[in-house]
């Protein structure tokens, strides 16, 4: 008879300790220690078997990549799904994870690949009703409602010759009989994910795991979950906005930082093949406090609108708020504007927003942000049909930007005829206005 053991585990890094503490001694995160009851029926095996070595220069098995019918998903994955790979998709509740996975498993992809959709959150009838709403009933995709790990693996094993792709929605609902802890705990997620990923790799099956996120946007469960899989994707978006962005944060078979853009509608997720044009649709010219940033997301050029609002404040410490951009970087740009060109906004509230619910981490967006702030502060719009890109240093100088030619081509394709950026080498166009300092930018917006 086994005896249940109690221990405390960090939900961030998975480190265990015999006593509770307010801070994890391994990763240093506060408030991440939770109590778990662990019961195991496995006997400890101390013997092993000899394994054969291989040479680094030996034969490499071909990694067969299978394109999906969803082009934006192919872009993020690096061209398609790789046999034997494990993919983790995280996102807020209701953002569209299950919709995307069901559209993949029940599309014409199912006519080429044998797909199994396993749900632990819905009944089979609920899945069928959602498939009817999304018009996905023409394809004979297998579905299974199960939450027990051993039952799932046994079901796949019995039909493994007829299964190429398995979708698990979601990993937080799966439990193993080896543990007495409830579903969604760190130990359950770690063991279940590890068993599923190992089984998929041993049998050359593609597995897609849907994952919940915490209130601060992190994947729920131990960090080791992200290390177990080959690819980590985040589904981003605002429930008040119909745009969704699928972004890769880890990819062993492709690039990191690639994005796919979708539009959520009544019939499911629709691909947005030209997001720049969609995000700038019906935009008015000569609007004070707005500018267009020519950005790069992964390998994709993307034009985004930057909006700024400046109002007088009676507070001792005026508010600075940024949506879709780093608030600390906004404070830095405001300090540089005050120090280098005398634009003092100490007694004003400053609000910055990226239109369309997008998030920008590209440092080349500094120049577009500065242009919006100068426009909002002076009451004068930026030049018509202009785009901005360039990183601002603490001295007020505009630094060179990577992939400048790609940004320029995207802007010209969408009808912009004035490019305001840092000085470029080997690129001489009449419509490029090079700026080397914030003083030059201030002269343009006047």
From Swiss-Prot:
CDD domains: RadA_SMS_N. A motif (RadA KNRFG motif) lies at residues 250-254. It is an enzyme of class 3 (hydrolase). InterPro entries: AAA+_ATPase, DNA_repair_RadA, P-loop_NTPase, RecA_ATP-bd, Ribosomal_Su5_D2-typ_SF, Ribsml_uS5_D2-typ_fold_subgr, Rubredoxin_2. GO terms for cellular component: cytosol. ATP binds at residues 91-98. SUPFAM superfamilies: P-loop containing nucleoside triphosphate hydrolases, Ribosomal protein S5 domain 2-like. Keywords: ATP-binding, DNA damage, DNA repair, DNA-binding, Hydrolase, Metal-binding, Nucleotide-binding, Stress response, Zinc, Zinc-finger. The keyword Disulfide bond does not apply. Its EC number is 3.6.4.-. DNA-dependent ATPase involved in processing of recombination intermediates, plays a role in repairing DNA breaks. Stimulates the branch migration of RecA-mediated strand transfer reactions, allowing the 3' invading strand to extend heteroduplex DNA faster. Binds ssDNA in the presence of ADP but not other nucleotides, has ATPase activity that is stimulated by ssDNA and various branched DNA structures, but inhibited by SSB. Does not have RecA's homology-searching function. Belongs to the RecA family. RadA subfamily. This is DNA repair protein RadA.
């Amino acid at each position: 008879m086994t005896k249940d053991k109690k221990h405390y585990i960090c939900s961030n890094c998975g480190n265990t300790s015999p006593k509770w503490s307010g801070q994890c001694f391994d990763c240093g995160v506060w408030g991440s220690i939770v109590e778990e009851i662990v019961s195991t029926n496995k006997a400890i095996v101390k013997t092993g078997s000899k394994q054969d070595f291989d040479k680094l220069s030996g034969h490499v098995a071909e990694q067969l990549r299978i394109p999906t019918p969803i082009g934006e998903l192919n872009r993020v994955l690096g061209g398609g799904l790789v046999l034997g790979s494990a993919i983790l998709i995280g996102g807020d509740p209701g953002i569209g994870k299950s919709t995307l996975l069901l559209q993949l498993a029940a599309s014409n992809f199912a006519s080429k690949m044998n797909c199994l959709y396993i749900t632990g959150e819905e009944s089979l009838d609920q899945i069928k009703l959602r498939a009817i709403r999304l018009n996905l009933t023409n394809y004979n995709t297998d579905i299974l409602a199960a939450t027990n790990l051993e039952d799932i693996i046994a079901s796949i094993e019995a039909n493994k010759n007829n299964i190429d792709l398995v979708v698990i929605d979601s990993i937080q609902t799966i439990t193993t009989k080896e543990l007495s802890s409830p579903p969604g705990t760190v130990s359950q997620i770690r063991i279940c994910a590890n068993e599923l990923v190992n089984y998929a790799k041993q049998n050359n099956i593609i597995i897609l795991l849907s994952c919940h996120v915490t209130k601060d946007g992190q994947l729920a469960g131990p960090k080791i979950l992200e290390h177990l899989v080959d690819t980590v994707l985040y589904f981003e978006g605002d429930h008040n906005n119909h745009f969704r962005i699928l972004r890769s944060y880890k990819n062993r078979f492709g690039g990191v930082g690639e994005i796919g853009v979708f539009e959520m509608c009544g019939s499911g997720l629709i691909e947005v093949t030209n997001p720049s044009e969609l995000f700038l649709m019906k935009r008015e010219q000569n609007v004070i406090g707005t500018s267009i940033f020519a950005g790069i997301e992964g390998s994709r050029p993307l034009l985004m609108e930057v909006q700024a609002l400046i109002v007088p404040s009676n507070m001792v410490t005026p508010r600075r708020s940024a949506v879709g951009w780093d608030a600390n970087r906004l404070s830095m740009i405001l300090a540089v504007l005050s120090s280098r060109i005398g634009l003092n906004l100490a007694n004003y509230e400053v609000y910055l927003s990226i239109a369309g619910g997008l998030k920008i981490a590209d440092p080349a967006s500094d120049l577009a942000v500065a242009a919006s702030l100068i426009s909002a502060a002076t009451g004068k719009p930026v030049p018509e049909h202009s785009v901005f890109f360039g990183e601002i240093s603490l001295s007020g100088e505009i630094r060179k930007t990577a992939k400048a030619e790609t940004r320029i081509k995207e802007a010209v394709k969408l009808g912009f005829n004035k490019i305001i950026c840092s000085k470029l080498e080997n690129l001489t166009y009449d419509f490029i206005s090079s700026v080397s300092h914030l003083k030059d930018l201030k002269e343009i917006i006047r």
